[in-house]
């Protein structure tokens, strides 16, 4: 199996981060609809479960990495009363433009801001945030370990990193059902609805290539987190990871 850094959306010589930026700029207008469709609406439930895991920490400032169209940032402001400010960073301007529209419609523009930044080189001082989150974005990092190191760096002592990611089921029969769905349904429907043949072939490939469960928890520990654990959701097709600095 190829390393996640080798799995890219397009067959070009461009670095992965540039390809990911181009892909999300291209599919931005379809992203939310397809995200809800392919997860059967469960992506909303997964976000809410993930948010509940950081709520006890009562963060005031949150960094949402790979914020996309801002769904997680908005849900954080809705459901965690202690949060004063969420900073969303992403490579894709088109995704964040949609996010800005959603934030304005929710009257949250005084609590959520967006910045186009690479998660591997965050423009923040050490110990800047009470929590860091990333939903459905870790597998797109050009270097997952470096991304974890950067998120660790900007966290305050004792603060949580929460990662929500898609995952490969390992139990019968969910594994077999997922493999068919990921290999045959997602690429065909995604190609038809998004007009991007590569983007929704890349999706299951990137999920398959990234470290998962114990492997990712161990990687989190290796970059400095004093505690790392995970919780499987919805027949193992999604996983929430928590790391404590």
Curated annotation (Swiss-Prot):
Give the record's keywords alphabetically.
Answer: Menaquinone biosynthesis, Methyltransferase, S-adenosyl-L-methionine, Transferase
Question: Is Transport among the key words of this record?
Answer: no
The pathway is:
Quinol/quinone metabolism; menaquinone biosynthesis; menaquinol from 1,4-dihydroxy-2-naphthoate: step 2/2
Please state the Enzyme Commission number of this protein: 2.1.1.163
Kindly list the positions annotated as binding S-adenosyl-L-methionine.
69, 90, 118-119
Q: Which reaction does it catalyse?
A: a 2-demethylmenaquinol + S-adenosyl-L-methionine = a menaquinol + S-adenosyl-L-homocysteine + H(+)
> SUPFAM superfamilies of this UniProt entry?
S-adenosyl-L-methionine-dependent methyltransferases (SSF53335)
- The organism's place on the tree of life at top rank: Bacteria
Q: RNA-binding as a keyword?
A: no
The record's section on Pfam families has: Ubie_methyltran (PF01209)
InterPro entries linked: SAM-dependent_MTases_sf, UbiE/COQ5_MeTrFase
A GO molecular-function annotation:
demethylmenaquinone methyltransferase activity
Q: Name one GO biological process term.
A: menaquinone biosynthetic process
Protein purpose: Methyltransferase required for the conversion of demethylmenaquinol (DMKH2) to menaquinol (MKH2).
Q: Which family does it belong to?
A: Belongs to the class I-like SAM-binding methyltransferase superfamily. MenG/UbiE family.
Q: Which HAMAP family match?
A: MenG_UbiE_methyltr
Q: Can you name this protein?
A: Demethylmenaquinone methyltransferase
Which gene is annotated as encoding this protein in its UniProt record? menG
